[in-house]
Amino acid sequence: MDKSEMDKINGTNPESTDQAPSLASRPDEFEEEESLVTPDALSARIGGFQIYAGSVNWGVFGSMKIVFLKSKLNVLIPCGFLAIFLNYMTQRYGWVFPLSMLGIIPLAERLGFATDWQISCEVGRLLNSAFGNATELIISIHALSRGKLHVVQQCLLGSILSNLLLVLGSAFFSGGLACGKTMQTFSKADAVVNSGLLLMAVMGLLIPAALHYTHSEAQFGKSELALSRFSSCIMLVAYASYLYFQLSNNRRRNEANVYPCMPLIKRRIQDDVDGNDDEVPEISKREAISWIAIFIAWISMLSYYLVDAIDGASKAWNIPVAFISVVLLPVVGNSAGHANAVMFAVKDKLDISLGVAIGSSIQISMFGIPFCVVMGWMMGKPMDLNFHLFETASLLTTVLVVAFLLQDGTSNCVKGLMLFLCYLIVAASFYVHADPNSKASEKPPQN
């Protein structure tokens, strides 16, 4: 019996003898390649092809369960209903105001959750840009419609100060403690661009204030308002250009990384293969849009009672309206962002923390404030960029401190503590600040 016949009896193929050792010599690679192409292996690796459909609760009750039961902050939702009840039954604004604040906090967090789904990277970033500070804008628009122009200015100013000092300081301090590093690093180039945008916003607010306090207006009472409206349009164009630049930059990076902006199911499979632990959206696109509309309407309703109770709460608590507007109101919109910034800093993802804190400040200063000026223009309200001397000085010093601390691209506990202490100084200054413009800001409409 010759050798070929013996090979047939033993079940071996003489032609495959050259390939067999190569496969046997690297069994791990062979198994890995097989797992990438075999449906059963791929199914076992990501939990089956039904992971996407199973992770998205398409039913109404499943969506409600996710939205209302997955956040511990939702225990505060009944506070909103209690605030409405007290407003109509007792009109005790000292209680209506804090209950309205507590009722809005979980709604703001859930609004952020509803905008978290992403069909593509660009859509996700645009949604976050549009709704990242929706709560502050809704409160500001309600105050604007009531003619409380200085409350609008101070609320938006307080949001910027809170993000730059309190949120960023907490992120730096917590990240330095948790990571056990002498220094944490972040993108110096992004920090420089962000600092430049913040300084541009300060310039937009500083010049109208200087025009007012130097009494150098060509037409008293009109030049300041006209300059504010013109500058607001310029700032909106600058912010739109910044968004376009950011999205274009990210698109180029995504193309270089091959797959980060692929459709969700493909990205989920690839990320699972690469070991990334990205979460699949828990609600569908249609459900997310519906919840966004519901939460905006709900926040808008509670904001009506919140704004209406500011003066009453100021008298009941014997604290200045400026302190309520600058320190307390920003807590409503910044609470969820504050927690996220600290969480990412603890995980040593400081660039994301800066995106939350400084990105929110840029959006308020370059979009929120100019948007309110334009909205006031449309409503016939003389909303301008003259935030008055004390408020503008507070913003200028804050931006300068933050810009200096960011210029080297590193952070530590000491920097975080410095920012936090600076916020305490600012908060105390508004507590003792007797606002001479609170009544002057209720100006008659001008055309």
Swiss-Prot record:
Chain intervals for the UniProt region annotation (Disordered): 1-29
Cellular-component GO terms for this entry: plant-type vacuole membrane
Biased composition (Polar residues): 10-22
GO biological process, one term: intracellular calcium ion homeostasis
Membrane topology type: Multi-pass membrane protein
The keyword Zinc is assigned to this record: no
Chain's role: Vacuolar cation/proton exchanger (CAX). Translocates Ca(2+) and other metal ions into vacuoles using the proton gradient formed by H(+)-ATPase and H(+)-pyrophosphatase.
Name recorded for this polypeptide: Putative vacuolar cation/proton exchanger 4
Species name: Oryza sativa subsp. japonica (Rice)
Lineage: Eukaryota, Viridiplantae, Streptophyta, Embryophyta, Tracheophyta
